[in-house]
Every structure is written in C-alpha cells, then in structure tokens.
Amino acid sequence: MEQDILEGKRILVVDDEHDVLDTVEDLLSMCEVTTASDFGRARDLLEADTFDLALLDIMGVDGYGLLELAVEKGIPAVMLTAHALSLDNIKKSREMGASYFIPKEEMVHLTTFLRDIFEARA
C-alpha cells in the first residue's frame, strides 16, 4: 500500500473560528497540525518553527500578512475563507504567492486539495 503523501506533514492552521480549527485537525489527523487563532500567535509560530504548509484564513487574522511571512520562509500557503471569496481576493492571494485558495464550504475536500499541492511540488 502506498504511503499517504500527507502522512506526518507539519501543517500550521490559522483561523479565528475554533470550530474551523477543530474540523481541520480532524480532517488532517494524519498530519502534525499546529493551530493558532490570532495573528500574533501565528506570526510567532511562523518565525520560530518550520512547516510543510500553512493554511490561512483571510479574514479575522490578517491572512495576507501571514501569507507574506509564509512566502518569505518558503512555506507553501493555502488561503481559506468563507466570506472573502471574490475575484479580487483570489487574484491578490495568487499575486502574493498563495499556492491555492479554498472556500470553507469545500473543506470536506481539504485532504484532496492538499495532496494535489504536495504531489505537484514533489
């Protein structure tokens, strides 16, 4: 049986909604997930640690500021949002270096999206 490409990946998940953090932790049980619910904590984690990927909420936690930090550290970043799904936000995320943009309504497919990202980078 082929090993899951997500197995053991270190993922930083940042969202100000604790139910979203819990859901992502459940969905990514094969990964080492670290969570943060505010910009300051997420910034500290990004500066002090190494992650294979950062999953960042756009609204509520200054996702664009965190995206900039992740890109500077060479950490692939995926933008996650429920309310900021607009062409401008998608464009800005891509221009700033985001690897992917996932609406929260599509979180059920999160593992598929992340596998695709890691396979494309392999």
What are the residue ranges of the model-derived segments?
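Non-catalytic signal-transmission and effector/linker regions of two-component phosphorelay proteins
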Residues: 1-12, 108-122
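Conserved acidic carboxylate
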Residues: 15
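Acidic, metal-coordinating helix/loop segments flanking the phosphotransfer/catalytic sites
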Residues: 18, 35-53, 61
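Two-component/phosphorelay signaling modules centered on CheY-like receiver
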Residues: 18-34
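Alpha-helical interaction/dimerization surfaces of two-component signaling modules
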Residues: 23-27, 45, 69, 92
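Short amphipathic alpha-helix used as the core "switch/output" element in two-component signaling
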Residues: 59, 64-76
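Alpha4 helix (beta4-alpha4-beta5 surface) of REC/receiver domains from two-component response regulators
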Residues: 65, 84-103, 108, 112
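Hydrophobic/aromatic residues positioned on beta-strands within the core alpha/beta folds
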Residues: 80-82
